[in-house]
Amino acid sequence: MSKKSTFIILAAGEGKRMKSKYSKVVQKIMGKPMILYIIDEIEKNFEDGRIVVVVGNKKEDVYKVLEGRNVRFAYQEKQLGTAHAVMCAMSEISDDSEDVFVLYGDVPFIKADTLKKLSQKRKEEAAALCLLTAIFENPYGYGRIIADENGNVLKIVEERDATEEQRKIKKINPGFYCFEKQELVNVLSKIDNKNSQNEYYLTDAIEILNRSGKKVVKVTVEDNFEVMGINSRYELFVAEQELKLRINKEHLSKGVQIIDIYSTYIHPDAQIGKDTVIYPGTFILGKTSIGEDCVIGPQSYIVDSKIGNNCHILFSVIENSEIKDNVKIGPYAHLRPNSLLEEGVKIGNFVEIKNSKLGKNTKSAHLTYIGDADIGENVNLGCGTIFVNYDGYKKHRTVVENNAFIGCNSNLIAPVKIGENAYVAAGSTITEDVPANALAIARERQTNKEGWVLRRKQMYENR
């Protein structure tokens, strides 16, 4: 049987510096809860990995974000230190695990390649533990790595306990560990809380292992962004700005043109085709996919939507919708959830669409509400058309078949069907089905009252 890995993610902290009623690890970075960055990275790269999340304060927030994910939970009722958190998770470790990784839910950008290097180095050196180190030009506040001439880690000295000479050391401990499972079990039984905080520190494991003749080795991270901890609103801001630029640069390298990488927000899970142009002030969020040769923005907001090739979306909001090729939207249009625009559709300014399908080459140029509708191909919806879908108790659907023409300022009272090639005269309120090829007129006949203005004027002058 192949050996597996267990990943313990510590997420029980109070997060006081974040000043939030929500758990720190569910705070969003580029629209994605930070703990999901770690979960996704593990799931994509460690097929047999078991994930154990240690929760404590505000645990319901973490449960909600991870609902439906293949993770196990361990509960740390009292926060008694990092080693204590790991102790709480030990019952969830798989029996056939060889490597046990300890990670942090508020250090979200660690990469799978770095974790694999920890495992590889530990095995090559037959070590009990391989820990990750980083080199910081300003190491203030971090524990310093004390190593021998062969690079073996002897201990970690915290900032408050370090001598002046030790404080000059720039190699620090960001807190990522890869233990051999049985060695972790053994060392946890030897860690005590005889310190000023009465807590169980996982860093004590290093000296305990060394005293037992066990080997402790290290790997230095190549990109310090991977070990960036996020504890405050400012650190959340800094992390988001850096991640935003990295995401945008990656899209640039793949052939996407981003006019201003500083004012464009692209979710890490979004996909964009080459030769698409993104203008400033645009937000592309969630699992959105955008095809090639599109023009998006400026000032567009797109979330969890699928957009085809050669689409233009200007100053508009798109939510949970699908847009096929060669569609033009905006300015100031709003596609609400479950909308489908087939190829060649044109949607103009101040058009709102909700839970509706528009067939090929259908047009709605301006000032229209389309709710709960099934609209065919080559339909023209005149300015001011309203699909009246709600009777005060429930929603009803409207059907408009191919090649129909809806005149301006018309109301279609659902449920109603407009037949193929039918015309609805401008200003009509339609309450009954319109047959194919028919003209529907539902308005008061015009009456011209000759001389009325002069008579009215004379009446007021004679008062």
Curated annotation (Swiss-Prot):
The record, for Pfam families, names: Hexapep (PF00132), NTP_transf_3 (PF12804)
According to its UniProt entry, the protein's GO biological process terms are:
cell morphogenesis; cell wall organization; lipid A biosynthetic process; peptidoglycan biosynthetic process; regulation of cell shape; UDP-N-acetylglucosamine biosynthetic process
**Region span, Linker:** 234-254
Q: Where in the cell is it found?
A: Cytoplasm
Tell me the pathway: Nucleotide-sugar biosynthesis; UDP-N-acetyl-alpha-D-glucosamine biosynthesis; N-acetyl-alpha-D-glucosamine 1-phosphate from alpha-D-glucosamine 6-phosphate (route II): step 2/2; Nucleotide-sugar biosynthesis; UDP-N-acetyl-alpha-D-glucosamine biosynthesis; UDP-N-acetyl-alpha-D-glucosamine from N-acetyl-alpha-D-glucosamine 1-phosphate: step 1/1; Bacterial outer membrane biogenesis; LPS lipid A biosynthesis
**UniProt binding sites for Mg(2+):** 106, 231
Oligomeric and partner information: Homotrimer.
Q: One GO CC annotation, please?
A: cytoplasm
The record's annotation in SUPFAM superfamilies points to: Nucleotide-diphospho-sugar transferases, Trimeric LpxA-like enzymes
Q: Where is this region: Pyrophosphorylase?
A: 1-233
UniProt keywords, alphabetically: Acyltransferase, Cell shape, Cell wall biogenesis/degradation, Cytoplasm, Magnesium, Metal-binding, Multifunctional enzyme, Nucleotidyltransferase, Peptidoglycan synthesis, Repeat, Transferase
Q: Does the keyword Acyltransferase apply?
A: yes
Q: Which family does it belong to?
A: In the N-terminal section; belongs to the N-acetylglucosamine-1-phosphate uridyltransferase family.
For the ligand (acetyl-CoA), the binding residues are: 389-390, 426, 443
- Region: N-acetyltransferase; residue ranges are 255-463
State the Gene Ontology terms under molecular function. glucosamine-1-phosphate N-acetyltransferase activity; magnesium ion binding; UDP-N-acetylglucosamine diphosphorylase activity
Keyword Magnesium in record: yes
> Lineage from the top down?
Bacteria, Bacillati, Bacillota, Bacillota incertae sedis, Caldicellulosiruptorales
Species annotation: Caldicellulosiruptor saccharolyticus (strain ATCC 43494 / DSM 8903 / Tp8T 6331)
What PANTHER family does the record tag this protein with? BIFUNCTIONAL PROTEIN GLMU, NUCLEOTIDYL TRANSFERASE
Q: Give the binding site residues for UDP-N-acetyl-alpha-D-glucosamine.
A: 10-13, 24, 76, 81-82, 104-106, 143, 158, 173, 231, 336, 354, 369, 380
**Which domain of life does this protein belong to?**
Bacteria
Q: What is its main location?
A: cytoplasm
Q: What is this protein called?
A: Bifunctional protein GlmU
Described purpose of this protein according to its UniProt entry: Catalyzes the last two sequential reactions in the de novo biosynthetic pathway for UDP-N-acetylglucosamine (UDP-GlcNAc). The C-terminal domain catalyzes the transfer of acetyl group from acetyl coenzyme A to glucosamine-1-phosphate (GlcN-1-P) to produce N-acetylglucosamine-1-phosphate (GlcNAc-1-P), which is converted into UDP-GlcNAc by the transfer of uridine 5-monophosphate (from uridine 5-triphosphate), a reaction catalyzed by the N-terminal domain.
User: What EC number(s) has UniProt assigned to this enzyme?
Assistant: 2.7.7.23, 2.3.1.157
The cofactor note reads: Binds 1 Mg(2+) ion per subunit.
